[in-house]
Amino acid sequence: MPPICNSIENENNSFELTTTISFLKKSKLFKKEINVNEIVSINISQILGEYNSFLINNTIEDLESAIAQNIHN
């Protein structure tokens, strides 16, 4: 599976993205039939807490890509 973050500027966020993907899987929000836009529209800061809210603004494209990759695996 390709890395979640491909660009250098996003490398620091790879742990947070992996953690987010793992959380979504465990929380039953992550299903094969899921619409990527629906999952992205979820208020991640509400789910994970204010500490992780920066993920929404800085890594939304990487998160969409990671979700899409995981759906196809």
From Swiss-Prot:
Specify the superkingdom: Eukaryota
Protein's name according to its UniProt entry:
Uncharacterized protein DDB_G0293616
Native species: Dictyostelium discoideum
Question: According to the entry, what is the taxonomic lineage of the organism?
Answer: Eukaryota, Amoebozoa, Evosea, Eumycetozoa, Dictyostelia
